[in-house]
Structures are given as structure tokens and as C-alpha cells.
Swiss-Prot record:
<keyword id="KW-0819">tRNA processing</keyword>
<dbReference type="GO" id="GO:0160148">
    <property type="term" value="F:tRNA pseudouridine(55) synthase activity"/>
</dbReference>
<dbReference type="Pfam" id="PF01509">
    <property type="entry name" value="TruB_N"/>
</dbReference>
<dbReference type="GO" id="GO:0003723">
    <property type="term" value="F:RNA binding"/>
</dbReference>
<dbReference type="InterPro" id="IPR014780">
    <property type="entry name" value="tRNA_psdUridine_synth_TruB"/>
</dbReference>
<feature type="active site" description="Nucleophile">
    <location>
        <position position="38"/>
    </location>
</feature>
<comment type="similarity">
    <text>Belongs to the pseudouridine synthase TruB family. Type 1 subfamily.</text>
</comment>
<dbReference type="GO" id="GO:1990481">
    <property type="term" value="P:mRNA pseudouridine synthesis"/>
</dbReference>
<dbReference type="InterPro" id="IPR002501">
    <property type="entry name" value="PsdUridine_synth_N"/>
</dbReference>
<protein>
    <recommendedName>
        <fullName>tRNA pseudouridine synthase B</fullName>
        <ecNumber>5.4.99.25</ecNumber>
    </recommendedName>
</protein>
<comment type="function">
    <text>Responsible for synthesis of pseudouridine from uracil-55 in the psi GC loop of transfer RNAs.</text>
</comment>
<dbReference type="InterPro" id="IPR020103">
    <property type="entry name" value="PsdUridine_synth_cat_dom_sf"/>
</dbReference>
<keyword id="KW-0413">Isomerase</keyword>
<dbReference type="GO" id="GO:0031119">
    <property type="term" value="P:tRNA pseudouridine synthesis"/>
</dbReference>
Length: 273
């Protein structure tokens, strides 16, 4: 079964646990998701069954939009409410102070990813190392914050809506916000609203050809050549310039790359549902 859709992950389950629920619900064996949500987080999770898991890397998932609540004064090594180690009782902040912090954290930001994250450290997920207490470091990275709106402030909880680039961490954004205020913060709630154009629509199966953000190309020879994965050259196609292209046929899809006057198959002969 090949399918792709947006699911709504509840809180309290890891993304893998939720995926197993969906596999049982739909009676499938092969499934995957794009963009891990932590157990305390909820919301939009792109899920695919069968061969459609191969298309994740070709989806445009920027910007990612979240609604989150930060707890000002709470310390947590994981940056969320699952590992709180200390809570400081603080006086409420003036709206002007919060607005100054918000405005200073737009555009490209350098940050250190959370140690409790799915980052790969020599073949092991960072969160697994963090849970064992093993010492390690993560490299500084960059994310882009396109917009951020403060929705409400009921001290010590500040709720905001943020739009950021793929790969960015809302927990890291909250840590940067806390530094502007001079105190630790952690997230008490996190919900992913959308990834690019992908939003939850009651698990409606999506048309793979409509959601792939790739230009189309056309092979001028026999379709059997594509099905057999034969070596091809740019002159065999209507468009010869470098790029990644979708080839759509009645029963299957292929993705090719034209680069330096050569053709390579990114994906070949994926059956259409």
C-alpha cells in the first residue's frame, strides 16, 4: 500500500509509538514519518506508507509553523517540561521587555541544538546519549525565524506562534528568548500547526504528483527504458538543463537528476496509488 497523508500526533506518545498505531489502524507493515515530534509535543506529522516513504526528501516542508508555550524561570536539560530541575519565582515582565526580546530574535539565528534531540552522534541519537548521562557536544547551527507573534502572556507562561525554517528547534528558540530575559526557560507545550503546505486534514490521502515540488520532464524514448533503469543522456529529454525532475507515467513515477551532462536516477519506478 502506497500512501502519504498528514496525521495529528497526540501528546504522550513518541512519533514511533504513534506510527505503530497508524500501521495497525491501516494494516500496513512499511511506514515512516518526516520530522520527529517529541512525546510532549503534538500536531502535524507527515506519514507515508510503502514506497512513498522514499519521497520525504523531495517535499518542501518550509516554513514550519508551531504554537508553543514557554515557562519562564523553569530549568530543564531537555528544554521541555519532562525534566524540570528547578523553578525560580520571578516578577512578571513588562510587555515592552518581551517585545524587545521577540524583535531581536527574527531572521537568521545561530543556536546549539538540544541534547535531547534526534541528532545523530556517531550513529546514536543524541537523546539516547543524554538519557545515559554521557558527555557530548553538538555543533552550532543556524535556523531562520520568519515570524513570531506573542499570543498571550499569563506569567510565568508565554504563548507564541512561530514560523521557522526546516531543521530549526523551537526549544532552542525558547532558550535564546530566555537568555534575552536573563533567565532559564523551558517549553511547557508545543504543537506543530503545519510543515510547508502540509496541514492535518483528517488523514486524507494526498496526491503524490500534486505535492511534489519538482518540475516535470519528459523522456522522448520508449518508457520501457525508464522501467528498466537504462542509462540515459540529457538529449533524450525535452528539458536538458541541470536539475531534479519528476517523470510521471500512468502507473508509476520516477525522479531523475541531470547534472554535468549526465543522468542519474534518484528514484525509479515507484508505483502510483
Amino acid at each position: 500500500m502506497n500512501a502519504i497523508f498528514v496525521a495529528n500526533k497526540p501528546t504522550g506518545l513518541s512519533s514511533n509509538q504513534f506510527l505503530n498505531r497508524l500501521k495497525r489502524k491501516y494494516g500496513v507493515k512499511k511506514a515512516g514519518f518526516s520530522g520527529t515530534l517529541d512525546p510532549f509535543a503534538s500536531g502535524c506529522l507527515i506519514v507515508a506508507f510503502g514506497s512513498y516513504t522514499k519521497f520525504f526528501r523531495f517535499l518542501d516542508k518550509t516554513p514550519k509553523i508551531y504554537e508553543a508555550t514557554m515557562w519562564i524561570g523553569a530549568s530543564s536539560p531537555s528544554g521541555d517540561n519532562e525534566n524540570i530541575t528547578d523553578v525560580k519565582i520571578l516578577k512578571p515582565f513588562a510587555d515592552e521587555s518581551l517585545e524587545i526580546a521577540r524583535k531581536s530574535l527574527l531572521g537568521r539565528l545561530k543556536y546549539i541544538p538540544p541534547k535531547f534531540s534526534a541528532k545523530n552522534i556517531n550513529g546514536t541519537r543524541a537523546y539516547k546519549l543524554a538519557r545515559t548521562g554521557e558527555e557530548f557536544s553538538l555543533k552550532e547551527q543556524e535556523m531562520e525565524v520568519f515570524s513570531c507573534e506573542i499570543l498571550s502572556y499569563r506569567h510565568p507562561f508565554l504563548t507564541f506562534r512561530i514560523s521557522l525554517s526546516e531543521g530549526g528547534y523551537v526549544r532552542s528558540y525558547a532558550q535564546l528568548f530566555g537568555k534575552r530575559l536573563g533567565y532559564d526557560v523551558c517549553l511547557s507545550e508545543l504543537k506543530r500547526i503545519s510543515e510547508g503546505k502540509f496541514r492535518f486534514e483528517n488523514e486524507k490521502f494526498l496526491n503524490i504528483c500534486e505535492i511534489l515540488n519538482l518540475p516535470r520532464n519528459k523522456y522522448l524514448g520508449d518508457v520501457a527504458d525508464i522501467m528498466d533503469g537504462k542509462s540515459l543522456k540529457p538529449s533524450d529529454f525535452t528539458t536538458q538543463k541541470d536539475g531534479i525532475y519528476l517523470l510521471e507515467y500512468d502507473k508509476f513515477l520516477s525522479i531523475i537528476e541531470i547534472k554535468n551532462d549526465t543522468i542519474s536516477y534518484c528514484l525509479n519506478k515507484v508505483e502510483k496509488c
